[in-house]
Amino acid sequence: MEDTMKFKDLKERAKDALRENFGAKLRLFLIPIFWGIISTNMTYQSNYNSNMDTVNNFDANTITTGLLLSILIGILIGGLIGLMISVIIDVITVGARFNYIKIYRGERENPRFKNIFTPFKDGSWTKIFVLHLVTALLIGLLTVTIIGIPFAIYLGLGWSQKDYILFDQLESGTYTGIWGVLNASAQVMRGSRGDYFLFLLSFILWYILSGITLGLAKFWTTPYIEMSTIAYYQNLIDTKRNMNQSAY
């Protein structure tokens, strides 16, 4: 019951932070939202087309070396373009999160759409890219084996605050590298991994709604969930700070 009340309070704080000038705050996540909708619908369309194909329509005699090479080159080029787009969207998403942190803390009342591109202007996009790449590789490698999945979940929850930690370190000038960010995130999440997992689980109906509507519900759920997780982070670091102060 205590966790439920705390989660409810954090979500109310998130709503309060979004309530005024919601349109401008929504615009910060428009690119990630539209990309999510496009990706979702492309996946559904691809699965549909695959199901429509049958073995009877495949003729191995029509496959030539030139055709096979063309297909492979097309797949390679498509993969590279997709990777570049994913990196750009990832950086823009983190740029939007940086702005949401400022909004939640009352440091930015009227956000502008161009603010999400700040990481590309100040060069922090490279830090974001490397941070996310290393995290994805390490967690991805652990999920290769069944026995590694629990460790991947443990690390994933421990590193879940990395974007917010990165923002604070960049703002305070204490950034020393990605490992400093990941270690700080793990430190902040010590004793709170299970609690944060339950917090994320409390949004499951919103995730289902987004899936049912083919992503259209994300125009509300994305700002709401993003601001709620920032509220959780702020509450987490405030609690840790108060505990440290009371220890002296």
Where are these regions (language model features)?
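Selective recognition of hydrophobic, aromatic-rich stretches within alpha-helical transmembrane segments
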Residues: 72-107, 140-176, 207-240
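Sec-exported extracytoplasmic/periplasmic mature domains
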Residues: 19-20, 121-122, 138, 142, ...
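Nonpolar helix-loop interface/hinge motif
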Residues: 1-47, 110-114, 149-223, 242-248
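Residue-level recognition of alpha-helix termini/interfacial anchor residues
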Residues: 21, 66, 124-125, 192
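Alpha-helical membrane-spanning segments of integral membrane proteins, especially the hydrophobic core
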Residues: 69-82, 114-139
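Short, small/hydrophobic-residue-rich motifs at membrane-helix boundaries and re-entrant hairpins
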Residues: 2-105
